[in-house]
C-alpha cells in the first residue's frame, strides 16, 4: 500500500500539517493552529507572557520562529515531553474538526509520512530516513478516532435502552487517550 506523504497545508492531506488553519482549543485557550499550541507549550511554564506572544503570532511559521528564539529559554524538560504535547494537540485538532477527522479516517491503514525536507525528527528529512514522529502520532490518533467511531456506532445501534445507557457511560477511546497523555505530562513536571 502506497504511503501518504503530506507537508504543506494546501496540498492533499493538508489537514495532517500542523500549519493547517484549523484552530485548536486546549487547556481552555484557543490557538490559530496546532503549531501555535505546540510552540506555546515550550514556554508557558517558564515565561507565560512570552508564551502568549507565541500564541498570538499571525502565522504558524512566526510562532515557530518566536518559540525557537534562543533569547527566550524553553522549559527544561521539553525533550522529555514534546512527543506527548504533540499527541495532545493532534488529538484535539482531529476531535474538534470533523473535516480533518473524516480525512484522516479515510486514509485507512496507509502509512502517513510528513515529507519535510528539513526535519528528520518530526518528518522523514531530506534523505527520507527520518523518524517521522508526526506521522507516527497521526497514525496513533487515527486508531483512537477509529475506536471512537466504532463505539459511537455501537451506541447508535443499541436496541435496548439499558444496553445503550451502559455503552454511553463508557469513556470514549479519545477521552481515555487524552487522560493517559495528560497523566504522563503531569508526572514529567
Q: What function would you assign to each model-found segment?
A:
Residues 1-189:
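Charged, low-complexity intrinsically disordered segments
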Amino acid at each position: 500500500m502506497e504511503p501518504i506523504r503530506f507537508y504543506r497545508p494546501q496540498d492533499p492531506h493538508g489537514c495532517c500539517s500542523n500549519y493547517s488553519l484549523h484552530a485548536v482549543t486546549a487547556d481552555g485557550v484557543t490557538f490559530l493552529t496546532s503549531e501555535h499550541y505546540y510552540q506555546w507549550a515550550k514556554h508557558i511554564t517558564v515565561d507565560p507572557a512570552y508564551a502568549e506572544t507565541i500564541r498570538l503570532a499571525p502565522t504558524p511559521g512566526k510562532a515557530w520562529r518566536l518559540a525557537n528564539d534562543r533569547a527566550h529559554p524553553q522549559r527544561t524538560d521539553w525533550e522529555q515531553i514534546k512527543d506527548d504535547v504533540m499527541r495532545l494537540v493532534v488529538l484535539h485538532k482531529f476531535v474538534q474538526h470533523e473535516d480533518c477527522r473524516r480525512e484522516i479516517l479515510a486514509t485507512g491503514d496507509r502509512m502517513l509520512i510528513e515529507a519535510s525536507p528539513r526535519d528528520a525528527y518530526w518528518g522523514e528529512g531530506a534523505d527520507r530516513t527520518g523518524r517521522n514522529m508526526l506521522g507516527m502520532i497521526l497514525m496513533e490518533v487515527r486508531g483512537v478516532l477509529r475506536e471512537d467511531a466504532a463505539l459511537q456506532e455501537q451506541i447508535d445501534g443499541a436496541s435496548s435502552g439499558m444496553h445503550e445507557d451502559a455503552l454511553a457511560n463508557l469513556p470514549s477511546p479519545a477521552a481515555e487517550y487524552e487522560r493517559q497523555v495528560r497523566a504522563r505530562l503531569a508526572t514529567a513536571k
